[in-house]
Amino acid sequence: YPKRTITYDNRLDFTKVKTLNFEEPDLKIFPCLGLAYEALAEGDSSCIVLNGANEVAVNLFLSERIRFTEIYDIVANTLEKHIKTDINDLDDVFEVDAWSRKIAMEMYNKR
């Protein structure tokens, strides 16, 4: 993972692209995108939790301690435990981020 197509020129030249087509993403195929939409709807602290938990889960995956599909489980379970809080300053951001990382690691250790 991921399966990648070999390309010989990695740059996208927008002056040569005639059209770009966008479709609604399939949230069954991309469930973490659904979590991001939910976090955006809930507000600031949820977005911070999503980010912190995702960073922990991705690092666990990259270090081969979890499967790719477990990223979703860790992030979703961390978000589920989160109680929305107001973010008033940078200290609040750091506090919520630290909490999310701690809970994400707890989720990993419980599995």
Describe the predicted segments one by one:
Residues 1-111:
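Catalytic, metal-anchored helix/loop core of enzyme active sites in primary metabolism
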